[in-house]
Amino acid sequence: MAIKEKQVQDYGENPIEVRDSDHYQNEYIEGFVEKWDELINWHARSSSEGEFFIKTLKEHGAKRVLDAATGTGFHSIRLIEAGFDVASVDGSVEMLVKAFENATRKDQILRTVHSDWRQVTRHIQERFDAVICLGNSFTHLFSEEDRRKTLAEFYSVLKHDGILILDQRNYDLILDEGFKSKHTYYYCGDNVKAEPEYVDDGLARFRYEFPDQSVYHLNMFPLRKDYVRRLLHEVGFQDITTYGDFQETYHQDDPDFYIHVAKKD
């Protein structure tokens, strides 16, 4: 029987030069995906988020939701359990496989779609009340063209008055003052270190170290909050509310994460 060769992340000779929107395909290898739930810790993340996303979706009358960054299925499964009709999209096959396994263990069946964000409308012809893109996923896009294309795709699959919920790490704080995460939201795993290894205006390279000493990386683009709000507006979203760590009132530099709720008029 052939022994399956262990995958490794490949950033070439100079990792900080890898600034490509398509490179996420090489980052979410099986070993990293298997540890992803250890990083986010479903129970702790559920406690830290509370009912924020469920409450926001219900306030806007949403019933059908497209989870554009399914990952290992955390939000898709929570929303299904809360009664929403969910389609689960991800560009990583490995993530979708893990998400389906996680859902099965909770006696749920995910409706998964493998698709790059920039081509969502090629694979999905339905329209949704809401699109969610969570887990700092949008920062995998390194070019403005890719960001605009992705937001336009999200806009297209939304019904009139539909909403996009998109989050991002507080890169303003990291770029201007350095990294000082409270580690309270999103990445809640015990004894898992998640911190930037290198940062400039075009790259935030994060290092993830697990209790077994295994180390993985992600190269992401450090998006500033006001830039994202401007892009959302220019693509067509008009009513945009930004929350800091699930609070509408926050000090500019305090949150670890921003959550944008943008309405299609």
UniProtKB/Swiss-Prot annotation:
Catalytic reaction list: glycine + 2 S-adenosyl-L-methionine = N,N-dimethylglycine + 2 S-adenosyl-L-homocysteine + 2 H(+); glycine + S-adenosyl-L-methionine = sarcosine + S-adenosyl-L-homocysteine + H(+); sarcosine + S-adenosyl-L-methionine = N,N-dimethylglycine + S-adenosyl-L-homocysteine + H(+)
EC number: 2.1.1.156
Activity control mechanisms: Inhibited by acetate, dimethylglycine and S-adenosyl-L-homocysteine.
Residues that coordinate or bind S-adenosyl-L-methionine: 28, 36, 45, 69, 90, 116-117, 134
Entry binding sites for substrate: 136, 169, 208
Enzyme class, broadest EC rank: transferase
One term under GO cellular component: cytosol
Coiled coil spans: none
Effect of residue 169 to K: The affinity for glycine and sarcosine decrease 50- and 63-fold, respectively, whereas the affinity for AdoMet changes only within 2-fold. Not able to catalyze the methylation of dimethylglycine
A biological process from GO: methylation
Disulfide bonds: none
pH-dependent activity: Optimum pH is 8.8. The activities remain high at more alkaline pH but decrease sharply at the acidic side of the optimal pH.
Keyword annotations: Methyltransferase, S-adenosyl-L-methionine, Transferase
Subunit relationships: Monomer.
Protein name: Glycine/sarcosine N-methyltransferase
Species this protein is from: Aphanothece halophytica
